[in-house]
Amino acid sequence: MKIRRKKNEIIRTGVVNVRCKLIIGLVALMTGAFALPASAQCEAKNDAFQTGEHVMYDLYFNWKFVWVKAGLASLTTNATTYHSEPAFRINLLALGSKRADFFFKMRDTLTCVIGEKLEPRYFRKGAEEGKRYTVDEAWFSYKDGLCFVNQKRTYRDGNFDEAVASDSRCIYDMLSILAQARSYDPADYKIGDKIKFPMATGRKVEEQTLIYRGKENVKAENGTTYRCLIFSLVEYDKKGKEKEVITFFITDDLNHLPVRLDLYLNFGSAKAFLNDVRGNRHPLTSIVK
């Protein structure tokens, strides 16, 4: 018999002047001048990517001051339909190498479906990390000015947890937030600006915080140097002390492609470097000559 545990999480936030403005790294939200219902807040014009885009990354893991090639990751975007409506399907595959398995086994597959106006519709993450395997899913819907998300985590033995959440802001997942972010203009950001937004993980909705750090030239794994925007995803402990979780470096051009990610783990650190990109919609004008 499969065990089902269900919890409800209803969050009504009085957000009057909110609209999506930037989210990179994969991510960010900006305060705007219009009061919009949740469904409209989740909509945006796609100015950054197109069907057929394929981005490849090399993954490295640091263990006792030694950097080890840990595997590969790929990010692909293709056209699809969802409930008979045209949509985009974005896939992120992270595959650890056999050498890296000695330290930490990683087999992650993330999929999201977004509408043509980039609103979140569905998210799935299948993760094999060490001896644990889980599937996290989220289904998004919109009604009466609220964004609803039904979430489910399924374990290897078939048991599962479920949760329902609602928010007057748009709720994102790990990939839909990246898709939206890539179409926004970061020109208005100042170094140190903090961007907060709700994200569905498949188990619950969490408040995330990003900090804009500025610009820097970054050399990718393919030997190309890019002018990049830098964002940090941070966490806060019970005393309010800030802890860096991920640092994102994204191209300062219309593509807003992640070039490098620095991840700070409990048992070490990891990096992801851009190796190759195909099918990009715009020229890579961020390349430093």
What name fits each language-model region?
Residues 1-19:
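N-terminal secretory signal peptides that target proteins for export/translocation
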Residues 2, 21, 40-44:
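N-terminal secretory targeting signals
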Residues 21-33:
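Bacterial N-terminal signal peptides
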Residues 35-37:
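N-terminal signal peptide c-region/cleavage motif recognized by signal peptidases
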Residues 41-142, 184-289:
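Acidic, serine/threonine-rich low-complexity disordered tracts
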Residues 138-178:
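Hydrophobic, well-structured mid-protein blocks that either form specific transmembrane helices
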